[in-house]
């Protein structure tokens, strides 16, 4: 489990960037796989999610995650509860209610956790390149503001994701980023493979968030290279493995 000091210093807010350790799953899902969308046993996933929720002093049904679709859709949680196999389709969650854990699942995409400790408003988002480019982080901030958060008070951390030296992309990939802002060239460097590039997803997210007046940091962990600690879709794909586990990052307000 990883914690960011900026979030840990907030009174009344708990957060966790979980590694793949500490669960009951085996094989390629070893061991804290929290994704019902994987081929893992649902009973194992349920137990893993129960363990995650228990670290917050809550039950498995208090842990809310989404059917993530690489969108900019953000849901506001009031008294809502749902079981994960029937979760709503979106990529961000916000709430001002204690007693609920907001989770974002990832296996190379970036989990992003948000908090305004003074207003007691929190958020969690899943940001792959499509969601990052579309503005899922900014959409999450906007949804938090509707609950009373102030962007100048927000603490935001981009969690473990595919790293700045690991995310190789094709020749066509940079075009929409450069069309959005020519300075986004800063997040691409040439790959050893001709015509390809290496993309800095976390760096791109941190700058985008900063440009809407919110300070953000990144944990700096690379899910592709840290095999023992994180699930990685790309690593499994390169190894010829068709499925993968899902890691969880989560945040909650204390009662």
Task: Report the location of each language-model feature.
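Active-site microenvironment for binding and transforming phosphate-containing groups
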Residues: 1-255
